[in-house]
């Protein structure tokens, strides 16, 4: 696995995590 694909995986995981966190916060936890 090269650094480019590793960065993409990290970016996708971070994006999905932040998105789910925003939705979770809007639902009032």
From Swiss-Prot:
Keyword Electron transport set for record: yes
Function: Component of the cytochrome b6-f complex, which mediates electron transfer between photosystem II (PSII) and photosystem I (PSI), cyclic electron flow around PSI, and state transitions.
Subcellular location: Plastid, Chloroplast thylakoid membrane
Protein's UniProt name: Cytochrome b6-f complex subunit 8
Major localisation: plastid
Entries under InterPro entries matching the protein: Cytochr_b6-f_cplx_su8_sf (IPR036143), Cytochrome_b6-f_cplx_su8 (IPR005497)
Transmembrane segments: 3-23
UniProt similarity note: Belongs to the PetN family.
A Gene Ontology cellular-component term: cytochrome b6f complex
Source organism (scientific name): Mesostigma viride
Membrane topology according to the record: Single-pass membrane protein
Keyword Transport in annotation: yes
Keywords, ordered alphabetically: Chloroplast, Electron transport, Membrane, Photosynthesis, Plastid, Thylakoid, Transmembrane, Transmembrane helix, Transport
GO biological process, one term: photosynthesis
HAMAP family (alphabetical): Cytb6_f_PetN
Superkingdom per UniProt: Eukaryota
Subunit description: The 4 large subunits of the cytochrome b6-f complex are cytochrome b6, subunit IV (17 kDa polypeptide, PetD), cytochrome f and the Rieske protein, while the 4 small subunits are PetG, PetL, PetM and PetN. The complex functions as a dimer.
A GO term for molecular function: electron transporter, transferring electrons within cytochrome b6/f complex of photosystem II activity
